[in-house]
Amino acid sequence: ICVGYVAFHLYALNIQPVEPWKFRLIHVSVGLLIGFLVFNSSNSFSSQGASFGRGMGVERASFILSSCVLIMVLAIWLRIPSVVFDEHSEIFNNFLSGISLAAVVVSLLSSYFYKTERGRMSRSDTALGIIALAVGIYIIQSLGRWNMVAGTPMASDVDLYMSLIGVILILELTRRVAGMAMVVIALVFILYAFLGPWLPGVLEHRGYSSNRFFTYLFTDNGVLGPTVSV
């Protein structure tokens, strides 16, 4: 994966340029995948592993849920079958939103509470990486629409949940790599976007809806901004 990741960057930067937003989304989503595979949720490991009992079951559940999310996103991209999107799009989108949230919650809880043996890759961390890929693919396949609706009230509920999950995954990997300090700083600014109406003086503002705020974060004024473009 790492070799392919580096090869993609060399190809895009030296041979064939890739559309900027698409390049940055691939950079972020595959980077998250590699990060979750490399960095464990903590520095402690189980002497007996998490391969027995409930630990193994929860790990498997997280992997299955994340795989379902990825398959559904790929189905949207390939429009297979088209009848799902033409006649039952609302049901499909609601199901995708629900299973995506369930996948990230189960995977995070599993990675926190069930420790793996040293040297063994956790299915829960793999599941988090798969979800990161799904988020990237979802935004890429809807990029033309995303450029128009991100940060506006027109953003759909699925757009909200996918961008929210993307932010959660970025914060979690930041915690694993850099510690809680960076996460706390980021959370303060996220809370500021919603608490503005109740703040005093010059800090007061009208506030933002979740749809507007989290989808706006996945634009070139947020996650896909100058830091990633360098």
At which residue positions do the language-model features occur?
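Conserved, well-structured core domains of diverse proteins
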Residues: 1-154, 160-164
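Hydrophobic transmembrane alpha-helices of multi-pass solute/ion transporters
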Residues: 16-23, 87-88, 147-230
